């Protein structure tokens, strides 16, 4: 070859020797550039390239000074392009060369000069050295299965030709297990004798290391096998011994508990009988597991364990007032209940049942009662329960059987006299698995619950010291169950009570949860009132607490997002900036007096509402139509009001001989909301009279009351909520049934001060105060 300059490629982890064929993966940019610049030799139509080892393995882009000058001239046999701009080449090392004038540009390029081997002077000695090296290599190959058999065959083939000593030395050198630096030194060595001597020394070292490692592995393997066998046998022996000891120890513990616990006579006899069976059983049998579980359950109940509670009604009252605002009647009845317990120290009174809409504090009241009595609190949620086994338990014969939740709660609180909440007692149902309401009869009957028998235990357990308190959203309970309980109705909070609860409880609670500093966020009273009126519609305060939480979060976000904002004041003017548009609206008084339109008062589970009732007359057949999603009772009230009006038409100076020629349509707005009840009778009657006499109704007058066909006004419920709605809506005068006057003592003073409350006993008194003028003896006839 005449050309003395070729592209140069640096290798990371390989030293090639002349005569060796090797594959190389090419991925670095300079190496790929060098590969692309190779040209076909004119002499033999072949591409050549220079390859050399770089001095530092981890160098990604070595400079020309970081390359060894002793390199290999290689012939490129094959180039295969791979994905990701890489390639695989197969090269044959042709000769050892000395590099000079290395150029470091886009790729390496260098001049080269072939380095010849020194002449072998003593061929006989060389033959002996090579034979020795080959024998060592064969021995090494037998110990190390990684050496390819083809390499051994190639070496044996070359040794038969006495002139190929150099090739044999190079092949042996390329397969030595040694450092890259040692291999590079072998490449640089020009003396064949010195090279073969180094190869023999390295092979000898490799064989010794391999034999030592192999012997060590054998010794370690035998030791591990022996250790594992000994460990397995030892652990098996320990497990067997432990099982035997544990069984004995566990049986001894069960026997000790039977003797030490204050079991009833019946329970002790049952426990001893079951224990005798267990001791005689095979401890690995399934039946022994059932018996063991039964005994563990029986002995884990708090037999004879009672909290030493001392009831102090003054302290209990303080706790109730601390945790709950308002609810005075409810608190008073609870204190009376506790007073009886304090004096008698025995529970024989009725079971309390707190009935009210969600969120009014029924569950938290029971917690406060437990704290006031100094007893533990247990809760049994009955919502959705339809299997009586939840109360009485499953019989032992069933797979996975367990005691009922009543005893389960006693086991949990570890006392036989807790305060137990029976939550959502109205939401039980029954199916083919039984009626849980009937199962509760025994639990709640003071004459029976001292002998309560759970199906799982099959022995009596005394529940007479448990204080049972139930809660419900509806008074619709099975009669037998209802008969065993004293119902306390919680009507819900009025606006003023919600305001005080928010100021004194909810806002401080949310500020504490969100780590609000003093004076960092202030929420005005009018903002809280707007929250109650326009963002919540409930009888309790759960939604109100959620809105206060949202308000606090948004205000805190503003403070943290803007360092210039140190505090935020929230009032009714900027409330919508935080919570968006108002969600609800309460009724407001009409802007002017209207004919055929009257303001009634309604009571819903979320409080009182103004109820507008309007009517029109048109040609027809003398019928009365009602719309607004009215219930049957309210429709009947409309019919009664119309009949009452027609019977009294002559008193108003009206002729009724043409009533069959027109229809009256009564509508109650908010048609999507169901409405029912008899208390709109007065308002319906007044609306019809106003329509037929064409006399307006005072816009600031609202009314409530059921009427009879004879015109008498009957009492209604929900007076407190209705009066609050009237006061809130701008009403000045409210007409109420005379029989409801006794309920005014429960109305907050501020509401009574804002309203003129007039009691009425008949519809004539209603018309006197409701209509702008009385329609008497006017000689009117109704014309369309």
UniProtKB/Swiss-Prot annotation:
EC number: 3.4.21.53
Inducing factors: By heat shock.
Annotated catalysed reactions: Hydrolysis of proteins in presence of ATP
The keyword Acetylation belongs to this UniProt entry's keyword annotation: no
Gene Ontology terms, MF aspect: ATP binding; ATP hydrolysis activity; ATP-dependent peptidase activity; sequence-specific DNA binding; serine-type endopeptidase activity
InterPro entries recorded: AAA+_ATPase, ATPase_AAA_core, Lon_bac, Lon_bac/euk-typ, Lon_lid, Lon_proteolytic, Lon_Prtase, Lon_prtase_N
A biological process from GO: cellular response to heat
Active site (UniProt): 679, 722
Keyword field contains Electron transport: no
All copies of domain Lon N-terminal, residue ranges: 6-207
One Pfam entry name: Lon_lid
Subcellular localization(s) per the UniProt record: Cytoplasm
Enzyme class: hydrolase
A single cellular component GO annotation: cytoplasm
Residues the entry annotates as binding ATP: 356-363
Keyword terms, alphabetized: ATP-binding, Cytoplasm, Hydrolase, Nucleotide-binding, Protease, Serine protease, Stress response
Family per record: Belongs to the peptidase S16 family.
Description of how the protein assembles with itself and partners: Homohexamer. Organized in a ring with a central cavity.
Primary role: ATP-dependent serine protease that mediates the selective degradation of mutant and abnormal proteins as well as certain short-lived regulatory proteins. Required for cellular homeostasis and for survival from DNA damage and developmental changes induced by stress. Degrades polypeptides processively to yield small peptide fragments that are 5 to 10 amino acids long. Binds to DNA in a double-stranded, site-specific manner.
PANTHER family, sorted: ATP DEPENDENT LON PROTEASE FAMILY MEMBER
HAMAP family: lon_bact (MF_01973)
Name the record gives this protein: Lon protease
Organism: Rickettsia typhi (strain ATCC VR-144 / Wilmington)
């Amino acid at each position: 070859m005449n050309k003395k300059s070729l592209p140069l490629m640096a290798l990371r982890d390989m030293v090639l020797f002349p005569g060796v064929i090797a594959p190389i993966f090419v991925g670095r940019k300079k190496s790929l550039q060098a590969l692309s610049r190779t040209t076909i030799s004119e002499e033999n139509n072949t591409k050549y390239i220079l390859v050399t080892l770089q001095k530092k393995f981890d160098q990604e882009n070595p400079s020309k000074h970081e390359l060894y000058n002793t390199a290999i001239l290689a012939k490129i046999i094959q180039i295969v392009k791979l994905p990701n701009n890489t390639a695989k080449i197969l090269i044959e090392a042709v000769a050892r060369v000395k590099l000079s004038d290395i150029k470091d540009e886009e790729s390496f390029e260098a001049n080269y000069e072939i380095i010849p081997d020194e002449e072998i002077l003593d061929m006989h000695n060389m033959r002996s050295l090579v034979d020795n090296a080959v024998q060592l290599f064969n021995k090494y190959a037998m110990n190390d299965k990684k050496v390819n058999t083809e390499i051994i065959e190639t070496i044996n083939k070359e040794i038969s030709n006495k002139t190929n000593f150099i090739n044999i030395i190079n092949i042996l050198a390329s397969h030595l297990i040694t450092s890259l630096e040692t291999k590079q030194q072998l490449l640089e060595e020009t003396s064949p004798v010195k090279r073969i001597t180094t190869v023999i020394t390295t092979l000898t070292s490799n064989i010794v290391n391999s034999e030592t490692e192999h012997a060590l592995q054998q010794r370690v393997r035998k030791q591990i096998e022996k250790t594992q066998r000994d460990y397995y046998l030892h652990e098996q022996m320990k497990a067997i011994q432990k099982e035997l000891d544990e069984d004995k120890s566990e049986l001894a513990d069960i026997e000790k508990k039977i003797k030490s616990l204050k079991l009833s006579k019946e329970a002790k006899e049952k426990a001893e009988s079951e224990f005798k069976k267990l001791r005689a059983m095979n401890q690995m049998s399934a039946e022994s597991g059932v018996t063991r579980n039964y005994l563990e359950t029986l002995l884990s109940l708090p037999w004879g364990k009672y909290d030493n509670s001392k009831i102090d009604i003054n302290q209990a009252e303080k706790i109730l007032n601390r945790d709950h605002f308002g609810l005075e009647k409810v608190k008073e009845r609870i204190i009376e209940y506790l007073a009886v317990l304090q004096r008698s120290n025995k529970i024989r009174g009725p079971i309390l049942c707190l009935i009210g809409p969600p969120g009014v504090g029924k569950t938290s009241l029971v917690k406060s009662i437990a704290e006031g009595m100094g007893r533990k609190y247990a809760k049994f949620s009955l919502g959705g329960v339809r299997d009586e086994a939840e109360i009485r338990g499953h019989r032992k014969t069933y797979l996975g059987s367990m005691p009922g939740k009543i005893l389960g709660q006693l086991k949990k609180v570890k006392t036989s006299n807790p305060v137990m909440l029976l939550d959502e007692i109205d939401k039980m149902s029954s199916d083919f698995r039984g009626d849980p309401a009937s199962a509760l009869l025994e639990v709640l009957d003071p004459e029976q619950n001292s002998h309560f028998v759970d199906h799982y235990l099959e022995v009596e357990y005394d529940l007479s010291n448990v204080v049972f308190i139930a809660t419900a959203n509806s008074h619709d309970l099975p009669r037998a169950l209802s008969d065993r309980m004293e119902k306390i109705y919680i009507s819900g909070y009025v606006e003023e009570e919600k305001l005080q609860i928010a100021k004194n409880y909810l806002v401080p609670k949310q500020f504490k949860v969100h780590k609000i500093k003093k004076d960092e966020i202030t929420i005005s009273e009018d903002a809280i009132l707007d929250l109650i009126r326009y963002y919540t519609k409930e009888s309790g305060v759960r939604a109100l607490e959620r809105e206060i939480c949202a308000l606090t979060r948004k205000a805190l976000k503003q403070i943290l997002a803007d360092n210039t904002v140190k505090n935020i004041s929230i009032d009714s003017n900027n409330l919508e900036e935080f919570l968006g548009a108002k969600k609800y609206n309460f009724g407001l008084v009409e802007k002017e007096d209207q004919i055929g339109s009257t303001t009634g008062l309604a009571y819903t589970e979320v409080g009182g509402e103004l109820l507008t009732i309007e009517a029109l007359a048109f040609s027809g057949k003398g019928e009365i139509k009602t719309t607004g999603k009215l219930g049957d009772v309210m429709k009947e009230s409309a019919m009664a009001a119309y009949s009452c009006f027609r019977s009294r038409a002559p008193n108003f100076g009206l002729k009724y001989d043409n009533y069959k020629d027109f229809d009256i349509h009564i509508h109650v707005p908010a048609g999507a909301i169901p409405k029912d009840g008899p208390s709109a009778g007065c308002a319906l009657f007044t609306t019809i009279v106003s329509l037929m006499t064409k006399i307006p109704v005072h816009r600031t007058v609202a009314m409530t009351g059921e009427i009879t066909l004879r015109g008498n006004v009957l009492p209604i419920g929900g007076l407190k909520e209705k009066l609050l709605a009237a006061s809130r809506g701008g009403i000045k005068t409210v007409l109420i049934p005379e029989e409801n006057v006794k309920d005014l003592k429960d109305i907050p003073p501020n509401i009574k001060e804002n309203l003129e409350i007039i009691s009425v006993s008949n519809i004539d008194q209603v018309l006197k105060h409701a209509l702008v003028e009385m329609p008497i003896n006017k000689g009117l006839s109704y014309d369309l």
